[in-house]
Amino acid sequence: MNRTFIITGTDTGIGKTVFSAALAGALNAYYWKPVQSGLEEATDSETVVQLAGLSRRNVIPESWRLNTPASPHLSAQIDRVEIDTDALAVPSVDAPLVIEGAGGLHVPLTRRTTFIDVFARWRKPVILCARTGLGTINHTLLSLEALNRRNIPVLGIAFVGDHQPDTEKIIPELSGVRRLGRLPRLAKLDPDALRQAFREHFDINIFGGASE
């Protein structure tokens, strides 16, 4: 069975897409963003293609593309569409698959369903991206508690940001969830720099090793 990883975060704008690009590039994986909110600037799928050095055939089209950069439920309402969360199913592919959510776990897709509800149905391992700055201990532990309460498997925590040794130590200690590594903020964000940073800060074998 091909490896599938769900990338979520403790908040929005913390680096999930950059981490997703790094992981997808390292595994030569497929990438899927089920719902994209906001189309005026580069989409997350376009960013991943650029940063991961992936072929466009490795990017699975979004199930919903919404115009307004807002929570998916609100974007859908503005666009006068309704997201059918029951129709969201993990794609079948012939290589590893990286799935990126939007914002945090409790971001609503509709007025009845949040991302964590869908993740609970999928039962695929989650990688939680977390900031290293002030406030992240509380946010990360709350997110892990929510995943645990729904029996969603968690592969580990991927920190994003400046090195904070105690923060990166105490969260795994209190939660029992392992630290996968830390992706530093890069002064020059390009495919080569991202590839090198991922190699230096993460063990590819944790994710099952690189694919041909």
Curated annotation (Swiss-Prot):
Mg(2+) binds at residues 17, 100. Substrate binds at residue 37. It is an enzyme of class 6 (ligase). The keyword Cytoplasm applies. ATP binds at residues 13-18, 100-103, 184-186. Pathway: Cofactor biosynthesis; biotin biosynthesis; biotin from 7,8-diaminononanoate: step 1/2. GO terms for molecular function: ATP binding; dethiobiotin synthase activity; magnesium ion binding. The keyword Ribosomal protein does not apply. GO terms for biological process: biotin biosynthetic process. It is found in: Cytoplasm. InterPro entries: DTB_synth_BioD, P-loop_NTPase. Keywords: ATP-binding, Biotin biosynthesis, Cytoplasm, Ligase, Magnesium, Metal-binding, Nucleotide-binding. Its cofactor is Mg(2+). It catalyses: (7R,8S)-7,8-diammoniononanoate + CO2 + ATP = (4R,5S)-dethiobiotin + ADP + phosphate + 3 H(+). One of its GO terms (cellular component) is cytosol. Its EC number is 6.3.3.3. The active site is at residue 33. NCBIfam families: bioD (TIGR00347). Belongs to the dethiobiotin synthetase family. Catalyzes a mechanistically unusual reaction, the ATP-dependent insertion of CO2 between the N7 and N8 nitrogen atoms of 7,8-diaminopelargonic acid (DAPA, also called 7,8-diammoniononanoate) to form a ureido ring. Homodimer. This is ATP-dependent dethiobiotin synthetase BioD. The lineage of its organism: Bacteria, Pseudomonadati, Pseudomonadota, Alphaproteobacteria, Hyphomicrobiales. The gene is bioD.
